[in-house]
């Protein structure tokens, strides 16, 4: 049985931990509101841009003149996996779920005889994936600590991917991130970046992006797509980073709330044990005093 001193130290330690988890929960809640607003504001722009590009590309996919970012290389041998996680832990299954989705995808590709290359965004994804894919990881970036992600950072990533594609380093690129649904729901997601997956003209019309009217473009569709597809690559990566930021804060807030409640339960349990132990010691001492008095 632990001594009273051990129990007091244990209770003090758990209370200190509870203060830390409570503070982290409050910080995550404050950051979540800003990150959630940014993610929700970025979605319509990214979706609308994809719809516009889908309208433009409706008659070009697979045809002559289609940009390579849209039609691809015509091969399926080398796959680039861009895995976006966070730099910090204590966020529940946020980082591990994204890394697991990417790992399973990589294993399937390698089982089919494909070559896999990986770029990690965030320290935690790098830590997990390099255990199995050290030779496949060709680049890694941090999320710049606690600073919120910005568009130039997404543009740097997109430019690197685009340069590697133009150099013929890969055929297909897939982005892995966590889509934010709510504080308790973040969905690990895989999105194909190259060749770009765009809504069809029919799908864009159904969502209001299209029209039955005949449209002419100046310059032509090919030229517009050549200009907008690289920008769309940046936009989709930026959206993924915003979704990730909101998902990370939501997961951390939920995890720290659970840790705070668990610490409270542990404090109650340890306090009860402490009181019972103290009561037993007092009772034992009283019995010894009474027995000694009777012996006299």
Swiss-Prot record:
The keyword Ion transport applies. InterPro entries: ATP_synth_F1_ATPase_gsu (IPR035968), ATP_synth_F1_gsu (IPR000131), ATP_synth_F1_gsu_CS (IPR023632). GO terms for biological process: proton motive force-driven plasma membrane ATP synthesis. Pfam families: ATP-synt. The keyword Transcription regulation does not apply. It comes from the Bacteria. One of its GO terms (molecular function) is ATP binding. It is found in: Cell inner membrane. Belongs to the ATPase gamma chain family. This is ATP synthase gamma chain.
């Amino acid at each position: 049985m632990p001594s009273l001193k051990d129990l007091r130290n244990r209770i003090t330690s758990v209370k200190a931990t509870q203060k830390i988890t409570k503070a982290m929960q409050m910080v995550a809640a404050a950051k979540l509101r800003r990150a959630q607003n940014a993610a929700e504001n970025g979605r319509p722009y990214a979706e609308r841009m994809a719809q516009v590009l889908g309208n433009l590309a409706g008659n070009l996919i697979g045809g002559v003149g289609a940009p390579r970012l849209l039609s691809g290389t015509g091969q399926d041998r080398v796959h680039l996996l861009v895995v976006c996680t966070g730099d910090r832990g204590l966020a529940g299954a946020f980082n591990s779920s994204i890394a697991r989705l990417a790992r399973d995808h990589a294993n399937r590709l390698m089982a089919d005889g494909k070559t896999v290359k990986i770029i990690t965004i965030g320290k935690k994804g790098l830590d997990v994936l390099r255990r199995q894919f050290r030779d496949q990881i060709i680049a890694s970036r941090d999320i710049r600590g606690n600073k919120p992600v910005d568009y130039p950072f997404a543009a740097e990533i997109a430019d690197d991917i685009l340069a590697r594609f133009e150099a013929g380093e890969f055929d297909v690129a897939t982005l892995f991130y966590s889509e934010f649904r709510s504080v308790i729901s973040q969905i690990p997601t895989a999105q194909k970046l190259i060749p770009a997956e765009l809504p069809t003209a029919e799908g864009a019309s159904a969502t209001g992006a299209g029209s039955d009217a005949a449209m002419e473009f100046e310059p032509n569709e090919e030229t517009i797509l050549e200009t907008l597809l690289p920008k769309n690559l940046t936009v989709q990566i930026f959206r993924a980073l915003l979704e990730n930021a909101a998902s990370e804060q939501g997961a951390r807030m939920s995890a720290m709330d659970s840790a705070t409640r668990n610490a409270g339960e542990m404090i109650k349990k340890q306090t009860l044990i402490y009181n019972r132990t103290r009561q037993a010691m007092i009772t034992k001492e009283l019995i010894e005093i009474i027995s000694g008095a009777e012996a006299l």
